[in-house]
Amino acid sequence: FFNLALATLNPGDEAIIPAPYWVSYPDMVLVAEGKPVIIETGAETRFKITPEQLENAITERTRLFVINSPSNPSGMAYTLEELQAIGEVLKKHPNIMIATDDMYEPILWTGKPFCNILNATPELYD
């Protein structure tokens, strides 16, 4: 993620980071002279960002969206349907790059196959 932020963010560009998040994500954005936009989540959404939260956070300066599933530190994992709904929002904003952090795929214990946002919404690949 660090190299991606350095390569793609210009001063003042925004990176949307759902909370809770890996501790260094915002700092990496700051080193790249970007602005971290933290979206708070809670127990009511099982610590997952909703499509509505994402849509409301997007501005003309948004260039990067970080999604980590299974998440560190919460351990939650997005479902295929949740990722498809988030993907529908992102399809409307082709200038936003997606950083999908799949580091914890091996500890997915839901009994369902692993799925990331690009598996759920392949149109986002380009």
Residue ranges of predicted features:
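A short helix-loop-beta submotif of the ANL/AMP-binding
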Residues: 31-37
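Short, intrinsically disordered, charge-balanced linker/junction segments flanking boundaries
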Residues: 12, 57-59, 119-126
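Hydrophobic/aromatic ligand-binding patch that stacks against planar heteroaromatic rings
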Residues: 7, 27-29
